Amino acid sequence: MEACSSKTSLLLHSPLRTIPKLRLCASISSEDVAHGRCSLTDQHLQIEGKNYSKTTFDHIFRTDATQDDMYTAFLSDTINSVFAGNDATVLAMGAKTNGKDERLYGNSVSRNGLVQMAITQLMNALDDNKDSEERIQVRMSAIMVSQNESSIVDLLSPFNPDPRHRVVKIVDDARTGVFIDNESEIRVETIDQALFYLNTAVDHRMIQDEHTHRTSHVFISLSLYSYKMGDKMQGGRRRLCFLDMGIGERNSTNGGMTMPALGSILLAMVQRNKHIPSRDSSVCQLIRCALSTSRFTTFVFSFGAKSDDNENIAHLACKIARTRAKSMVGHGRKSSGTMSTGTMESNSSSCGTTTITPGGTPRTQRRFELESGSELSAAETVIFLGPNSSRTASPASTTMPFTPTSIRPLHRTTRNHSGVEALSKPLSVETKSSPTHNCHDGCIHSIPPMLRGHTPFLSASLKLYDELCSPPSSSRASPAPPAAFGGKTSEKREDFGIMIAQPSIPLMKAKSKYNLDDGKMKQIMQWMETSEAPPILFSSPCYENSATSVEELRECVGILSHPLEDIIEQEEESMRTSTATTGGSKKDHPLRILSKQDLNVEPEIKDKQEENELELVMAASLSSMRSHDILAKLEAMRNAQNGNSVQNIGNSQSNTDMDVSEMDVYRRASHLEEYAMQRVREIEENKLKNKKKIKLGLNCCQQQSMISSGSTVVDWSQIERKKEKEREVHEEEMRKEMLRERRAKLKITELEIKRERNLIDKELDDKKGIANSIARQLQHFSLSPCRGGRTHRSVSTHRIDPPNASLPSTPTMSHKKVIGGSLAKLSASGASGSTGAPPSPALGYHQSLPRHSKLPTSVNGRRASAERERKSNKASRNSCSKERKISGSKEELQWRSPYAQMTSPKSYGGPGTSSSGRGSSAPGSDFETPVVSTTEKSANGTIPRSKRQSYSASSGYESANDYHIYSTTNKKPHILDKKRNEEKLSLVRQADEIRHRQWQLKKELEEAKRAIGQEDDAKMIANSSDQRLNGLSRTTMIDAMLQENRILEKRLVACRNHSMLVTTFI
């Protein structure tokens, strides 16, 4: 394939050197004028109180402007540019208003929409300019992009025969540009078909609320694929697009695109900038797909109820106008304020020129015979020029009507039908018998009655599917109902309309053969032989006439897909021509294998030459039976949903008055071969289980039907319920079995854990060791008596009080009595030993004694002297200072007492006369203050007062300090015990791991023994226990278990090797 051989031609048609034509239009509705949003003067256009120059817009359509005025202003030139080989786009932008919807889609016969007028004029022009050497095919697509959901919806997907249902996406390819992939491009042949698909897309747009309308955009395109046949074959594509855009979110709080963001994208596309804002968003990609290849773009702005939205639209229009003026001046052209009506300016770099004929019809002269918009704008379409790369320059022209002709209105489903009239002329119904399969043949142009009410893409509450999925039909009777497949057309049809509408002008005949080179023909034939094509129903003379060639038979049986159509396409007109040349052969019924007439054929008629024909007929009958099964299931599902009772069991008689178009609907309804094969497999599986079959009449549309006599169908609802019950029972049994297995495994694991736990407890249950450890710990807390005098060792004992003994406590009377009595005895004995001696001053106040010191007693008379007393006081002071040093050096190991700086209480000699200071009154304490008896008085007759003396932390709180010091000095034995316990626990853990590994090896060895047939050894291994290792030390037991694990591993390897050898010999 070669597109262009000359470098000059490539530069001439380069997109960078081609200036796209741009027009700006504004539409003012009656609502805008009534609410004061817009007003028009002689010089300015006032929008929301601000004046804008009228020269900003090429055309301003007032409230009294008609649709014909808009067609004359820009739509006729747009269609002319498409026929001249360019891509054209009409972009309508504005809020949701009645004025915008009426301008685009119309609402009555007198007020047709722009999209409908473009479709009508385009199809009429194709019929009027039909060329025998050129074939033009029109395909229609419609998608919707939602900003809120970030999704792309294919509005024509219900009519796409492709069973794969691939996801539609917009691809940004650096080599080919932006294009829409996997969209449903439906082939249209007549105006009514195009309007039917347009009706589907428009209904999606009409039912949207204001917010959804703002954030969604609808893209409708009509693609013209042209192929020129002759000594060489040329082809290309041009496209007419309509982009109905919203105005975006009101604010960007939720992350959506607003009107300024959309305006920046449009402005960047008009300015041909390399950097485009929001390049990765689906909305930006859709705008690029619509405007990147367009050579003739028209903006139609409309205004809404929000003042800020109207101001944003006006600012965007001004910016686009300034950009257009700069681009024209930069390329040496003078910008004109307003374009003349019905004309199109010539462009120095465009593909051709447009002139006005004397009759008022614009005629476009093209540089070459056939040019494509893709050739001039982008490189996304392959152009096949045949084996010869040279291009002829024979002039050709395309004539377009200047004024719009009679246009059929849209069959609106969301509007009032009072203004809709019948079609101007009826359409004849003809069923196509062409075996050539393309994207349009599998499309169902109307829906059977059983499917009505089941909306595949709208909500059930809207109830629009009944009229949405049926093209507009005429109430008049068809003048000449055709007789195809042996059937008749019913004249009293109200359930749905036409099937395939035939154009009013007969199609031109095409050549039966194509001038292709041998290499291309071989590739096509190889593809047709290797492709897997599902059987189809058709009646063709290819197998009626046995004298046909092998090539023609392959053309009839083979199914061409869309990629092969881009190279070469066989249209229905070529098959119609070949059918007419074969003579008046009578067409057989597609279900003739199920009728009695074909079952009673005499065997002598069948011969060897008709075997191929029989195989084709059997394939058709199999497809028909699949259709019956599918429709029967759909009918059963419909009856179950509506709550209707099952019809009476019986056999239905065949009806020969079946309408041909209705039978074609049933045949086409089963084109999804994957689903049909699945249903056939289910029938074969249930055939052995279900002995009793319920025979129901095939009443698919509750009208006249045609079924072979004796045909049986299955009650799919009952079968599905039974299968569902069996499936539930089976699943329940499987679940119970899994639970049982899990319970058994848990029991085994529990027994193993118990056994291991008993072994561990037995190893750790060493009573003698525990008793020794407890005895060693108690030795540190044992109470040892202090060494006192020689004769009175039990009088004074030194013991360690708990920490709470150091807290202040009030002395009780019982304590005082005991202390007073004991001291009285001591004083009496002392008086008898040394008469006339003064009382010891040590008995008059509290004295702090060092640890393990002796209490002062009166047994020895040597301690009664004052000199001894002073020495004892000096020694006590030295011991207190030493204890303070020791306590200071051990600050990090013990807590400092909060009462360290407190003084001892004042004692006035009598009970209950102590001060509020701290005094040690615990019974048996080493620091009790001797109480002076009441008999001892001073010289003046008063009780002598004790001296007040301050004590440090070692005086009254020696017991608390001793407790903390004891706790810190006895930490070393505890750390050693902890290390020993950790060693024991590590040995226990190691033993557990080895024991678990041994258990795993035993299990694997048991399975290996069973695999080679040694059941006895397997039982012995399973019943073996570890009781023989009891009583051993831990290290010995660990060594023994390691040795046993090595032996088990060797035995396991030997068993596995033995099993492999046996398997190899077998």
Swiss-Prot record:
It holds the Pfam family Kinesin. GO terms for biological process: axon guidance; cell migration; egg-laying behavior; locomotion; mesodermal cell migration; microtubule-based movement; negative regulation of motor neuron migration; neuron migration. Phosphorylated by unc-51. Isoform a is expressed in the AVKR neuron. Isoform b is expressed in the CAN cells and in the body wall muscle. Also expressed in the motor neurons of the ventral nerve cord and additional neurons in the pharynx and head. Residues 387-406, 931-957 have a biased composition (Polar residues). Residues 335-363, 827-837, 904-925 have a biased composition (Low complexity). Residues 402-874 are annotated as: Interaction with unc-73. InterPro entries: Kinesin-like_fam (IPR027640), Kinesin_motor_dom (IPR001752), Kinesin_motor_dom_sf (IPR036961), P-loop_NTPase (IPR027417). One of its GO terms (cellular component) is striated muscle thin filament. GO terms for molecular function: ATP binding; microtubule binding; microtubule motor activity. It is found in: Cytoplasm, Cytoskeleton. Residues 717-765, 987-1021 form a coiled coil. SMART domains: KISc. Residues 332-514, 514-715 are annotated as: Interaction with unc-51. Residues 328-367, 387-411, 471-491, 569-592, 784-815, 827-957 are annotated as: Disordered. Keywords: ATP-binding, Coiled coil, Cytoplasm, Cytoskeleton, Developmental protein, Differentiation, Microtubule, Motor protein, Neurogenesis, Nucleotide-binding, Phosphoprotein. Residues 880-894 have a biased composition (Basic and acidic residues). Required for posterior migration of cells and axon growth cones during nervous system assembly. Belongs to the TRAFAC class myosin-kinesin ATPase superfamily. Kinesin family. KIF26 subfamily. PANTHER family: KINESIN-LIKE PROTEIN CG14535. Interacts with unc-51 and unc-73. Isoform a: Interacts with unc-33 isoform c. This is Kinesin-like protein vab-8. It comes from Caenorhabditis elegans.
